[in-house]
Amino acid sequence: MNIAVIGGGVIGEAVARNLAKAGYNIIVTEKRSERIRELERIGLRVTSNNRLAARQADIIFICVKPKDVKGVLEEIREDAENKIIISVAAAVSLSFLRKLAPKSKIIRTMPNLALIVSESFIAYSPSPDLSQEDVEVAVKILSVLGKPYMIDESHMDAITALSGCAPAYLALIAEALTYAG
């Protein structure tokens, strides 16, 4: 299965690296030349062309900052038709994603930083028009990255706040316990 990871930052790299390790054929997109070299150095196939990556993919991960989602989806809209798009962009609603890519199969997710070691809690909300088969394919892929849990999208913003902060709070508690003896 071919998977495009649009955005080669920390989260995009973690998604790409872990899926590649699991045997998926990955292409990552990144605009910054120094970051492209870093991603290539760790063995990932990289391009700066989002449309090319989307065209070659069966599934597309959107791993860009929320402010960049609109531009990316407008750019790849035609190449993403009838494909599963998994967005990890915080605070970007399913309705917004569906409006930008109406012919794609959208899943909104929120992983946490434990994604780096494939141990993330991953909340996900599929678009209501997704088939059970599409959801199962996405869950299989998300399972490589951690533990996926389907939630109602109305809870996603709260989960985003908790999921993003929980590892930091646990690290703070662990550090305090270490100093306390």
Question: Which sequence ranges carry the predicted segments?
Answer:
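A general structural signal for well-ordered alpha-helical segments in protein cores
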Residues: 12, 32, 36, 57, ...
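Rossmann-like NAD(P)(H) cofactor-binding subdomain of soluble oxidoreductases
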Residues: 15, 42, 50-55, 59-124, ...
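Internal alpha-helical scaffold of NAD(P)-dependent oxidoreductase catalytic cores
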Residues: 99-105, 121-159, 169-181
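NAD(P)+-binding Rossmann beta1-loop-alpha1 motif at the extreme N-terminus of oxidoreductases
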Residues: 1-48, 52-55, 119-120
